[in-house]
Amino acid sequence: MSTIKVLNMAGAEVGTVELNDAIFGIEPNQAVVHEVVKNHLANCRQGNQSALTRGEVSGGGKKPWRQKGTGHARQGSTRAPQWTHGGIVFAPKPRSYSYVLNKKVKRLAMKSALSAKAAAGEIIVIDSIKMDSIKTKDFRAFLTAVKADGKSLVVTPAKDEVIVKSARNIPGVVTSMANLINVYDILNAKYLVLDKEALAVIEEVFA
């Protein structure tokens, strides 16, 4: 098991913690990670795009001109796709893009993402992430103290409204509960900032 420092919110070292190699020490499977990220983005799609086919556009019931003798190409409707204001060929309609992946695949991707962060030295463990009041300035100072400036995913063991509201106005900073973290958020962040209790939850869930 690898050992990393545990810091307090002022950035001072207060101890160490061992990371479970079964979660933080595997060889990352990039193909599986790619598939899970693709699935996450597909599931996030609204899928509400919509356009009208030639049969749904109003008007166009009358033949624009007679079939023969005008010198023009033959036309049957002013709402055919080649006309301005005509319908759309194979018009997109609202649909769901979501699909289901196997739990084992998602679990392997999560372990791969966590292992990649650990190998890169981008996991920061805090003994306790707590704030007395909602204060964005103080939360930014905390991230600076622990050297987690920039895009960061801050993980707490349970929902903490004070932490959520203190962090939400800081660009690039995302908060999450330990049981709700996902591969996309982990990879999208430069630093993974974990409450020590949140680390225990992650190891319990994915061990």
Could you describe each region identified by the protein language model?
Residues 54-90:
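Glycine/serine-rich anion-binding loops at beta->alpha junctions
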Residues 31-68:
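A short, flexible low-complexity segment enriched in Lys/Arg and Gly/Pro that occurs
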Residues 1-46, 91-207:
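Extended polybasic, low-complexity segments that bind anionic RNA or targeting/receptor surfaces
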Residues 4, 8, 18, 40, ...:
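Exposed boundary/loop context
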